[in-house]
Amino acid sequence: MATINQLVRKPRKRKVQKSDVPALQACPQRRGVCTRVYTTTPKKPNSALRKVCRVRLTNGFEVTSYIGGEGHNLQEHSVVLIRGGRVKDLPGVRYHTVRGSLDTSGVSDRKQGRSKYGTKRPK
């Protein structure tokens, strides 16, 4: 334990918290342009073709973003909105595309959990 005199001379250092989503620069979402849309395979116990896209953001960062939901309409030069949130079984994917905003369509025929996939309420 430090004495009061030692703390007066040299105060305690604050721990600096490192951001999980540095490319957002403390913003809730960021806009960007798709530079490449492709599929990748997940890490060891899982098996699938996960849809991801490489996005050049308005602040100059280039990040990999996951496209959630069944089916999508994204291609190169599509303008997308990305949010934070990593995909545990895809290394290097720390962002999600926001469905139903800008050029990204919502998931069609979605009945439950619609707000997460940008789907309007069915009539």
Swiss-Prot record:
Any one Pfam family match given in the protein's UniProt record, by short name: Ribosom_S12_S23
Stored PROSITE patterns: RIBOSOMAL_S12
Keywords tagged on the record: Methylation, Ribonucleoprotein, Ribosomal protein, RNA-binding, rRNA-binding, tRNA-binding
Signal peptide: none
GO molecular function, one term: tRNA binding
GO cellular component, one term: small ribosomal subunit
InterPro entries: NA-bd_OB-fold (IPR012340), Ribosomal_uS12 (IPR006032), Ribosomal_uS12_bac (IPR005679)
One GO term of the biological process aspect: translation
Region (Disordered): 100-123
Compositional bias per record (Basic residues), positions renumbered to this chain: 113-123
3-methylthioaspartic acid modifications at: D89
Superkingdom in the source lineage: Bacteria
Subunit record text: Part of the 30S ribosomal subunit. Contacts proteins S8 and S17. May interact with IF1 in the 30S initiation complex.
Family stated for the protein in its record: Belongs to the universal ribosomal protein uS12 family.
Physiological role: With S4 and S5 plays an important role in translational accuracy.
Protein name (record): Small ribosomal subunit protein uS12
The species this protein was found in: Saccharophagus degradans (strain 2-40 / ATCC 43961 / DSM 17024)
Gene designation per UniProt: rpsL
